[in-house]
Amino acid sequence: MPKKVLLIVKSPPYGSLRVTEGFRIATAMVAMDILPQLLFIDDGIYCLIKNQRPEAAGLESYHERLKTLADLVGLNAVKESLLERGLKTADLDEDFRVRTITLDKATDLLIENETVITF
């Protein structure tokens, strides 16, 4: 039985390669039949905002990779992180079909998984 893995995205999408590399790792895990759970919290919430155009700034777009991960493993966003940033679920990209969860539920995800990796 594969290990249960939780990938926590808490960094903003731009300014470093941390998040992009995290999405690459998640994609590689899926290719190895490990289906990680993805949790977006803190500034990681900004990865999920609709109408982003990183290529306009010369940055790599992660939209298709994240959409694929959404289709395969699902994406969870902490509701409190949205609210703290003045965001609503309507601000999230519909392509990602994000499930908003409470901080208590996010804590449950931490407990349920054997391995936790943070980006």
Model-derived features: where do they sit?
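An anion/phosphate-binding loop that grips the pyrophosphate of nucleotide cofactors and donors
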Residues: 113
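Extreme N-terminal starter segment of soluble prokaryotic enzymes
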Residues: 2-6
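Short acidic-hydrophobic, aromatic-tinged amphipathic segments that line or gate anion-handling sites
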Residues: 97-104
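Histidine-anchored nucleotide/phosphate-binding helix
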Residues: 19-38
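Short, glycine-rich nucleotide/cofactor-binding loops
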Residues: 7-20, 48-53
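Short beta-alpha junction loops
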Residues: 42-45, 81-82
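A glycine-rich helix N-cap at a beta->alpha junction
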Residues: 54-82
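Short glycine-enriched, charge-decorated loop/helix-capping segments at active-site entrances
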Residues: 51-56, 92-96
